[in-house]
Amino acid sequence: MTDTSDRSGPLLQLLANGLGLWIRSQCDEVGELNLRLNGSALQLLRGRLVSVELMARRVTFQGLPIKHAQLRSGPLHVHLRPGLPQLQDAFQLNGDVTMLGTDLNRALLSDRWRWLGDWLAAQLMGLPTLGSLTVDNDVLLLEAPVINAGDAIRRRFRLQAAAGTVEIRHLEAEDAVQLPMDPGIQIEEARLQGGQLHLRGIASVSP
């Protein structure tokens, strides 16, 4: 678990340490975290930073396990208060996030995200409960149990980015749904590959 930053001076190092602590406080778990601050100590004294680049592995954010994230911020406004620098104002993040299909399955069956798994089962399969989710190369497989029948229904889907969110489309029908999405997040690309979900997008972050 390492934090790295541009070694342009003690002010940037102090800010890098503060940002690292803030990022970890926003996550349930962080395995590896690397930061690079783009700017100069002079800019920082004026309360400005050009951008921050972030690379993280094995992160759990709001109950969602992320294998890998590579993000870059827009310009940042920083208040150099005594002891610990503080970010001012909202800022933008853009970049890529990768999740393993097996991890996504566990998340959607967890208490925190069960509502979304069951919503998918209801919207896409007409059944109240999601049994499992599997990513088979570039295909999404959903399974839902049939109540009182001792059996399960399985359906295959593809996904893509649409209207700022993720659209899931039935392979054998015209049915499709768009995931409910935080208005501060815009998904620009969504694809399945090698048992993993890859997302690219932009998010507005409030410190």
Task: State each model region's role.
Residues 24-103, 205:
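N-terminal beta-strand/beta-hairpin edge segment
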